[in-house]
A protein has these predicted regions:
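A short, N-terminal "cap"/entry segment at the start of jelly-roll beta-barrel domains
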Residues: 1-50, 123-168
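Conserved short histidine dyad/triad with adjacent acidic residue
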Residues: 35-43, 49-68, 95, 103, ...
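Short acidic-glycine-tyrosine-enriched beta hairpin
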Residues: 87-103, 200-217
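Ordered, small/hydrophobic-rich secondary-structure cores
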Residues: 8, 13-98
Length: 238
């Protein structure tokens, strides 16, 4: 069970023999159109902190324009989305895209068909912060830098106002890291190569396109081959 695991794979259709469960109905007052049916599975959460990570799917709907209620990272697995902005511009999201909407950002969710996504949500007060990533929808640029694969490198592309959530693209050369106690929760998607994650319960290899989750406080070892690239979505409790 993931509740007792130090790390685990995030399955696109939810855990084996559990799958995705139907969630409560959206408030009709928040919708312009649609009668969406949303299903999901929460893999890890801190309800008192407004934190959760998981996978969900949903049928089509269009929301009212308004401030986004949470900081949310999303990795789209299926479908497409249009995020309309007050200035008339639109951000187009499609399957394979990773993106972040910051809490309080004004936009309209316009989804014309079925979508499935992996997500991380962080809620809480919004402190004053001068961070450019709080003033836009950040679509993660997976090829922003052409790194030298002999050198490990991280490119931070989003930091929330509270400083508790960040999104980075990490590129690693060949690595063999001994067990280290983790100081944050981490949702990781392998973009290229593979990584071997180990803990007291054993080792698991994750390859290109797979997503896994590491819990804060776990003693985790890591091994990678040459040319491994990952998206790390990190949450550090306040």
């Amino acid at each position: 069970m993931t509740e007792k695991s130090s790390f685990f794979k995030v399955e696109p259709e939810g855990p084996l023999r559990i799958g995705l469960q139907e969630w409560e109905t959206m408030d009709p007052k928040s919708l312009v159109s649609g009668n969406p049916i949303q299903r999901g599975h929460i893999y890890h959460e801190y309800p008192n902190l407004g934190y959760m990570t998981g996978v969900c799917d949903c049928t089509e709907f269009v929301e009212q324009m308004g401030p986004y209620q949470v900081d949310e990272f999303m990795l789209f697995l299926e479908g497409e989305l249009f995020l309309d902005l007050p200035d008339g511009k639109t951000v187009h999201i499609k399957a394979g895209d990773a993106f972040i909407i910051p809490k309080g950002f004004e936009c309209r969710w316009r989804q014309l068909g079925y979508v499935r996504k992996i997500f991380m949500i962080v809620d809480g007060d919004i402190p004053q912060a001068r961070n450019p990533s709080l003033e836009r929808i950040t679509v993660v640029n997976l090829d922003k830098q052409k790194f030298d694969f002999d050198i490990s490198n991280k490119d931070i592309q989003f930091l929330n106002a509270a400083g508790t959530m960040r999104v980075e693209v990490e590129q690693l050369c060949s690595l063999a890291q001994p067990p280290i106690k983790q100081i944050e929760n981490k949702l990781v998607t392998v973009l290229e190569g593979s990584v071997v994650i180990g803990a007291t319960e054993g080792e698991t290899t994750f390859g290109t396109g797979e997503t896994f989750y590491i819990k804060k406080g776990a003693e985790i070892s890591m091994k990678t081959n040459l040319k491994t690239k990952m998206i790390n979505v990190c949450y550090q409790m306040p």
